């Protein structure tokens, strides 16, 4: 607040003929001047410690500027990190082994690789090499052939066993009818059955009528 405005608002009176030789301000009969002074003390001096200084705003602005330049510096650092990550990915064993396996697939020994072999020689590599296992198809066919051989062997063994049984029966029952030897249990035989009221449709002598 400027001093001239303070003088205008207080409406003070000047007494040039006072006891002292200097010009003084008489505010004894003006009751508003104390309120202005108290209001000034109340609004500024008592609350001064609780308000932020104007100088701090200047530091905040400078701090924002520092953060702004730090952001660009951090972005450059992050970009350098991406370049380093790409460089590491190019020489990483997994990607190099994967590229070598796609170009030249081969079976590898299960050994831990101390370094990446970039000479397209994948005899020694990691334990689980990333590759296209083209030999699995032949393994499936080979397994199918093995199972087919097993089934064929079982069928051949069954046929041989059946032939042996037939030969044994033929040699033993040479004089017996051929139909009875080869098809046991399939010849006709007489079967006696008892019905509810009569037996064999009244053609048997085992029934009783009025003789009881």
Swiss-Prot record:
Alphabetized UniProt keyword annotations: Hemagglutinin, Secreted
Originating gene: hag2
Species of origin: Eikenella corrodens
Protein's name according to its UniProt entry: Hemagglutinin 2
Subcellular location: Secreted
Reported function: Induces agglutination of neuraminidase-treated erythrocytes.
GO cellular component: extracellular region
Chief subcellular location: secreted
């Amino acid at each position: 607040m400027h001093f001239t405005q303070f003088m205008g608002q207080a409406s003070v009176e000047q007494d040039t003929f006072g006891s002292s030789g200097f010009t003084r301000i008489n505010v004894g009969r003006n009751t508003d001047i104390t309120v202005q002074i108290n209001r000034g003390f109340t609004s500024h001096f008592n609350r001064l410690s609780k308000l932020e200084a104007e100088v701090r705003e200047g530091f905040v602005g400078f701090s924002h500027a520092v953060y702004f330049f730090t952001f660009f510096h951090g972005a450059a650092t992050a970009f350098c990190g991406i370049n380093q990550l790409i460089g590491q990915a190019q020489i990483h064993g997994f990607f190099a082994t994967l590229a070598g396996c796609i170009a030249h697939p081969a079976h590898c020994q299960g050994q831990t690789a101390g370094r990446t072999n970039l000479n397209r020689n994948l005899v020694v590599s990691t334990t689980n090499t990333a590759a296209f296992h083209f030999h699995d198809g032949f393994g499936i066919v080979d397994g199918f052939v093995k199972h087919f051989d097993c089934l064929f062997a079982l069928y051949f063994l069954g046929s041989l066993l059946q032939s042996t049984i037939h030969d044994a029966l033929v040699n033993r029952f040479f004089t017996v009818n051929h139909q009875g030897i080869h098809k046991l249990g399939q010849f006709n035989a007489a079967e006696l059955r008892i019905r509810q009221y009569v037996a064999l449709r009244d053609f048997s002598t085992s029934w009783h009528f009025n003789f009881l």
